[in-house]
Amino acid sequence: MHSPPRALRDAGMILGVMSDTHGNTDLMRSVAASMARLFSAEIIFHLGDDYRDAVELSQAGYDVRMVPGLWCPEYHDARIPRRIHETFDGVTVAGVHAEKDLRHIERAADIVLTGHTHKPNLAILGRTFYINPGHLTARIHRGQPASYAVIKIVPGEITAVIREAATDAIRETLSIPRDLPPQRDN
């Protein structure tokens, strides 16, 4: 395992999020190492394209949650889930590669993770935090520098940070309070 014991970190849980590695496993491994070493990420979400990259990350000892992307043969394999839906420290996280795969699971989620667009984005709609980490395809792709996200869940709030893959520098930060009950549409 590549993350430190929980007792050695501040209170709260740290999640790393990456997407659209498209075979760039050198950059993916470098970012995963930063997530673990610099930010103490306990779990890494890999949101597809390429699913085999995520498998490699898991085989390297990281705790990975993964979904296939649209370009992966695994996307068409009914045995492989296209959605992640899990609760961490009382916060429900839903993850997919493309928004079309959400199919209303976001209604029961506090955090929704998506990839596919290669554009990083942090947004709050109602009480739901939407996070797209960007891409790790190349240093620059479609005019966007490679990026990833780090999420910190603490008792009072959830904070997400988009970071540049090349330098780990902060590109964008957004927080949402946790002390308010979620408002869900029926």
Positions of predicted regions on the chain:
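Flexible, glycine-rich phosphate/dinucleotide-binding loops
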Residues: 53, 73, 102, 139, ...
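Charged phosphate-binding loop/patch that engages nucleotide di/tri-phosphates or the phosphate backbone
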Residues: 154-186
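A short, polar/proline- and glycine-enriched secondary-structure boundary/capping micro-motif
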Residues: 27-28, 104-108, 141-143, 168-177
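N-terminal active-site segment of His-dependent metallophosphoesterases
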Residues: 1-64, 79, 144-146, 178-186
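Extended active-site neighborhood of metal-dependent phosphoesterases/phosphodiesterases
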Residues: 56-72, 76-93, 111
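Conserved beta-sheet core of the metallophosphoesterase superfamily
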Residues: 65, 87-157, 161
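Active-site metal-binding loops of divalent metal-dependent hydrolases
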Residues: 19-23, 48-50, 70-72, 98-100, ...
